[in-house]
Regions:
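N-terminal leader/signal peptides at the extreme start of proteins
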Residues: 1-9
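Short glycine- and Lys/Arg-enriched binding-loop motifs that mark or flank ligand-binding interfaces
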Residues: 4, 18-21, 45
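Alpha-helical hydrophobic helix detector
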Residues: 15-31
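Aliphatic-rich helix starts adjacent to a transmembrane/signal segment
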Residues: 33-47
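Periplasmic/extracellular, small/polar-rich flexible segments of pilin-like filament-forming proteins
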Residues: 53-124
Length: 124
């Protein structure tokens, strides 16, 4: 008498695997949902860093040769020094930089309800 053996998983084993995968998904999903907010903040921080760098480079260029660079009297003027301009959807809060020459001030850039500060240096 030959008894054939069947290979495979039992129903209980399959159900347990599905339950374990469900628990793992429930634990991991909230971590991936918040990544979107972190990415938006990182993008705004990157633009703020680029604006700070553009302001410093513009200041050095204009100080070395008054014919180069852009005059900066308020925070929004820094966008003119940024190569390619300010990206679409980003807004710089207008704030005067006083006194008018060689003063550093903190400015704010906003996009997607996220904000970041950057340093602007005024120069005539």
């Amino acid at each position: 008498m030959n008894k054939s053996q069947q290979a495979g998983f039992t129903l209980i084993e399959l159900v347990m695997v599905i339950v374990i995968l469900g628990v793992l998904a429930a634990v991991a999903l909230p971590k991936f949902v918040n990544v979107d907010d972190d990415a938006k903040q990182a993008a705004v921080n990157g633009v703020a860093g680029a604006l700070s760098s553009a302001s410093a480079i513009n200041y050095a260029s204009r100080k070395a040769n008054s014919g180069k660079g852009n005059s900066v009297a308020n925070c929004t003027d820094v966008a003119n020094s940024l190569q390619g301009g300010l990206p679409t959807g980003y807004v710089i809060t207008a704030a005067a930089i006083t006194p008018a020459d060689t003063t550093k001030t903190d400015c704010v850039v906003t996009a997607n309800s996220k904000t970041a500060n950057f340093t602007a240096t005024s120069i005539n």
